[in-house]
Structures are given as structure tokens and as C-alpha cells.
Amino acid sequence: MNTRKTFAFVALCCCALWANAQKLTSPDGNLVMDFSLNQKGAPVYELTFKNKPVIKPSTLGLELKREDPEKRIGFEWTERKDKERVDEKMNLMTGFKVRETHTSTFDETWRPVWGEESEIRNHYNELEVTLDQPENDRYIVIRFRLFNDGLGFRYEFPQQPNLNYFVIKEEHTQFAMTGDHTAFWIPGDYDTQEYDYTTSRLSEIREKMKTAVTENSSQFVFSPTGVQTALMMKTDDGLYINLHEAALVDYACMSLNLDDKNMVFESWLTPDAKGDKGYMQTPCNSPWRTVIVSDDARNILASRITLNLNEPCKIEDTSWIHPVKYVGVWWDMITNKGTWAYTDELPSVKLGVTDYSQTKPNGKHSANTANVKRYIDFAAKHGFNAVLVEGWNQGWEDWFGKSKDYVFDFVTPYPDFDVQEIHRY
């Protein structure tokens, strides 16, 4: 290839990349998000704050679960290409082309039901990108909203013949960090968030994971570099970055898994017992993925991105909603001074069949009438608004570690808990 042809080829490539590129700026101009498609047709975004890189070029997409036809009786692949074609249909990561883009600006002030502020401003610039996947004759939408304090984006799946019902195998949303930041993190765990926070460099997460995973009654740590959101970080040049999500409805919770060689986080969804990470029916969308950023740590706490991206309140009469202080009949059980269970002599419980009146009380059941009255007296004397009572209803003997569909009876009290007397008192 001669020099002239080489130059022409490079120029054409640059033009093609430029044609796919879109830029979105926050209302105050401090944040800039760039969107493009790479050579594989994968969606890519990057984010800067006051000309400082926050998120390096990061890819977006999902991997769908393939229903294996080989498991069907009498089915055989006729050609290798048939299997490859099915695998390709599971790809919502590459092979995209930009069909159209729309930009808009939104600015409103709304009143929360309650909170730290009486009014919240919802001000952002939006980029809506419609992406066609010609190979599979389907399309998706990625919607970006850029606020003065951060970025929110989500996947949207319009209803269409070739994308109706689908199962999520993995979500491959990346957050590529610009360095080995200081992070304030807890282990990624499907079952609990009850961990102390660890402060370390991103590169130290793997090393410190063993000591960070303290004993808990129920836990499932999914990766030696997995962490939970919200994840807080600080860069060496003074930026504060928070990764989280908003509007989590009918979708799996997102944790983050770190590639600690390249300092790239990728979304990690919580699976069900089969390992599936989402059962979707179009039209539908993912939760918002959020990146809050500032050079002032106070602005991270003051950010209202999560509230602004959540759906508006649909409750018409909110007059009954107000904050309260309460005491609870549960801490003495956690400290082993009492129990949730009424008796210790039952090998198992069958709801509606087990007759607790014929069993021997263990003498340590905390949610009994006399003890709850004592808590009510304490709350009334010291200005608390309510008393939370755990362990009053039947079934707590089998509450943990049993493969059981129906553990609790939510209407029938233990023999030592008189609902009517508590109500009267």
C-alpha cells in the first residue's frame, strides 16, 4: 500500500469513527461525556470533569443466555455455523450501528415527601442513542443524562419481533478507572452488606479481601476483587468518584468486579439459584448506572442524582408518610440474650400443623407480651414514636438454613404474644 492510499484509508477510518461520535456536556459545562462505537461496533463512553479524565473509554452491552437446543429430545446441530449463529444472537455487545441520536435539556424543581430539603432541582442534558444490530435485526436504546454532579445512563429495550422475552446471562457495563485510586469498599456479596468498610488502593483489594470478609451468618462473596455499590473513591489529583445505581426495579442488584491489572470495573449482577441474572420482557429497561464526581467531597453527599433518576412518587396522598424514631425488640436476640424462636424442642415446624401450645417454651423468647409492654413504656417515656417487634409470629424455629418455601406464618402469634392486649395497651 503506497503512502497516498494509506493516508486515504486512515482518513476514512477517522471519518467513520467521527460519524459515530457524540458529545454531551453538563449544564454548567464542567462534565463532558463522549459516546462512540469502536471498530467492533461496541458502544463506548468516557467522562471528564474540568478537563480531568474520570472514566476512560469503557464499553457497554449485555450478554443473553442461550437456550441450548441440544438439550431438546431428538435435536442435533446440522452445521457448526448453526450453533455460531445462535451464539451470535445472544450478543448485545457488538455489531451495532447508530440509527439516530436525540439531545434535549430538562430542568424542573420538585418537592420530596420528606428529606433534608423541601425542594430538589432536576437539571440535566440528555443524549438518546438508538443502536441497530443489523445481523440480528433488532435495536436498543442507550440513554445518557448528564447533571452538574455526575452521569446517569441506562439500557432500554423496545418491544420488537426479535427481542421480546430474553434472559440476561451477564451485563457488561464497564467503568474504566484512570489510576490506582483510593477506595472505600465492602466485599461484593450476594447475601449481606454487614461488613466494616476497608480503605485501600484498588490494587490492594485482592490482598485485603480475606480480612475484609468477616464472619456473618449468611454470606456469599462472588470474587476476590468484587465490591458492592455504592463505591466511593478518591483520586490522587483530588477527585471524588462514586459508582452506584438508581431506579432498581424488576432487575438484579449491581455489584462491581475489578480487573485489577487494568483498573476496570465491570457490572456484576446478583443471580438467582440457576445462575440467571434477569428475566426480561420488552418493553423494559435496566436501572440507571450512576457516576457522581466532584473535587469537593461534600458535593458527593449533597448530590441528588439518585433521587432525580428514581421514578416520581405515585402515591397520591402522602400525608401519612413521615419519619419516626423507634426502639426494637431485636437487638437482645442479636446479642444472644434472647431468641426469635418460642421453643427449642421442635426438630421442624409445619405451619398450621405444629401446635405450639403443646411445646415447652425456651424461656428466652423476647417477643412476648410482657417484654413488649416494657418496650412500649420505655418508648413513651423517652419520646420514641414506635416499637418494632420481631419474632412474635410462628415459624422462627425454621427461619435460617432450611430449604423451605413457607417459613413464616405472618398472622398467627406465638402463645406468649397477645396481639389484642398489645393493641389495647
Predicted regions: what they are:
Residues 121, 143, 282, 319, ...:
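Catalytic cores of large soluble enzymes that bind and process phosphate-bearing ligands
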Residues 180, 283-286, 292, 309-337, ...:
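Feature activates predominantly on carbohydrate-active enzymes
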Residues 297-316, 320-325, 369, 373-376, ...:
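Carboxylate/His-rich catalytic cores and anion/metal-binding grooves
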Residues 326, 338-425:
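Substrate-binding cleft of carbohydrate-active enzyme catalytic domains
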Residues 23-316:
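N-terminal accessory beta-strand-rich subdomains and adjacent acidic, glycine-rich linkers
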Residues 155, 296-298, 333-336, 393-396:
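Solvent-exposed loop/turn segments at secondary-structure junctions
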Residues 1-23:
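Bacterial Sec-dependent N-terminal signal peptides
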